[in-house]
Amino acid sequence: MRLIGLALGLLLGALAQAGEAPGEALYRQHCQACHGAGRLGGSGPTLLPESLSRLKPAQAREVILHGRPATQMAGFAGQLDDAAADALVAYLYQAPPREPQWSAEDIRASQVQPHPLATLPSRPRFEADPLNLFVVVESGDHHVTILDGDRFEPIARFPSRYALHGGPKFSPDGRLVYFASRDGWVTLYDLYNLKVVAEVRAGLNTRNLAVSDDGRWVLVGNYLPGNLVLLDARDLSLVQVIPAADAQGQASRVSAVYTAPPRHSFVVALKDVHELWELPYANGKPVAPKRLAVADYLDDFSFSPDYRYLLGSSRQARGGEVIELDSGARVASIPLSGMPHLGSGIYWKRDGRWVFATPNISRGVISVIDLQNWKPLKEIVTDGPGFFMRSHADSPYAWTDTFLGKKHDEILLIDKQTLEIAHRLRPSPGKVAGHVEFTRDGRYALLSVWDRDGALVVYDAHSLEEVKRLPMNKPSGKYNVGNKIGYAEGTSH
C-alpha cells in the first residue's frame, strides 16, 4: 500500500504541474470505461452532481473504495489511497464546464428507420412458434440472439447498442420488441422479419422503457436529462418530452417506468422527489401525470396481481410501502430488511391466497409477503444476496439465485407451498448463474451462466435434468414472448 501511495503521489504531482485536475485523470483511468466520457453514463450510471444529490461525498468515497451492493461496482481500495479517493470524489461533485443537453430537436435528429414497418411482410419468415421465441441479451459482446423456444436453436443473432438494459418490452401481438440502452438509444426490432425497424436516441442516460398495452406508445425514463420521452410505437418518432419534476418544480431523475395493463396507464417512480406518477392513455396521449405523494423515494417497485396496489422501496433500506393507486393512499408499511429487489419479485397462490416473494440484494434472504394483509410470512435464508426470481404457473418452484454472494454459481429452487429450499442447481461450478425464464408452456426453464465463456442452459422444469447447453457470450437475460405479452404469473413485468 505504501508503494501504491508513493506512485499515486508522484502521479498527482505530475498532473498538477501539467495543469490537469488529478480527479479527472483518475476518473479516466478507473471509471470512464463503465461511466462514460464526460461522466455521462454507460454501463454504469451518470456521475454528475445532480445525479449524486442523494449521495453524500463521504458515502461516495465509501463506494469508490469498497464497492456497492446490487451493482457491478467493485471497490478500488487496493488501487487508490486516501488522497486519490478524495481527489476523485471532489471531481465527481464538480459541475462540468458545459451542462449536458439533449433536446427534443436532438431526439428528432437522431431517429433512423432502416426498415419502415409498412414495407415489411406481416407474417413470420421462419418456421417456429412466434409466441415461444426467446429474446436473449448477450452483454459480453453486445449482441441479441433470437431463439426458437421449441427446438432451442438460434434463428438470428444481431449486434445491439452498447449496454442494453436487461428488460426489453414487446408489442401486444408479440411481433415487435423494444430495447433501451444505458446511453439512451431505443431500438425497435421486428421479430417476424428479423430486422431493425427504427432507432432513436431518447436521452443521454436511460433507465428503462415501457410499452402501452394498446401498442400505441413507448415511454422512456431517463436519468439524464431527468425526463420522460413519449414515442410513437410504430416508428419511434418523438411525441412529447415530459420533464420529471414534482409539484414544486424540484427536478428528478426517473427510477423506473412500467405499464399497468388493466389500468391502461404507465406508472413512473421518481428517484429524487417524494412523488409517484400515473399517466393514463386510454383517452389520449399519456402526458398529464396524476401525482401521488409517497413517504420515501422509490427506487424499485412491483404491482399486486390486480394492479390495484403498488409495493415500493428505497435503496436506503427502510422497508416497503404499499400505495393504493386509485386513491394514492398509503395502506401499509412492510418491515423488509436489507435491500429487497422488488422489481424482480414474483407472486403466486399459496393455500388460496396470493403471496409475493422478493430477492434481496444486500442480504441472503427471500422475503415472502401475504398480499391480503401485507404481513411478512417468512424470510427464507439463502446462501447469499440474490438478484433474480422466476417461476411459472405450472411450476411447483420459485427459482432464484445467489448472484451477489460467495456461492454465486448456485440456483435455488424454493417450494412455493412449503416455502423451503427444495433443490440446488450448479450449472457451471465457479461461474455466476442467474436469470431464469420458462418456455411458454412451463415445460422447460432456461438459465444463464454469466460469463464471456458462458452458456444458456436448458433444464426440464419438472425432472430438473439438463436438456441442452448453448454457448453464449454472457447471456445476461432471456425473455419469452408469450410469457411477456401475457404478463404471465412468475415472470417480470
Swiss-Prot record:
InterPro entries: Cyt_c-like_dom (IPR009056), Cyt_c-like_dom_sf (IPR036909), Cyt_cd1_C_sf (IPR003143), Haem_d1_sf (IPR011048), Host-pathogen_enzymatic-act (IPR051200). Heme c binds at C31, C34, H35, R68, M73, R182. Heme d1 binds at H165, G167, K169, R182, R207, N208, H341, R390, H435. It catalyses: dihydro-heme d1 + A = heme d1 + AH2. One of its GO terms (biological process) is heme biosynthetic process. Pfam families: Cytochrom_D1, Cytochrome_CBB3. Residues 19-96 form the Cytochrome c domain. GO terms for molecular function: electron transfer activity; heme binding; metal ion binding; oxidoreductase activity. Monomer. Consists of an N-terminal domain that binds the heme c cofactor, followed by a long linker segment, and a C-terminal region that exhibits an eight-bladed heme d1-binding beta-propeller domain. This is Dihydro-heme d1 dehydrogenase.
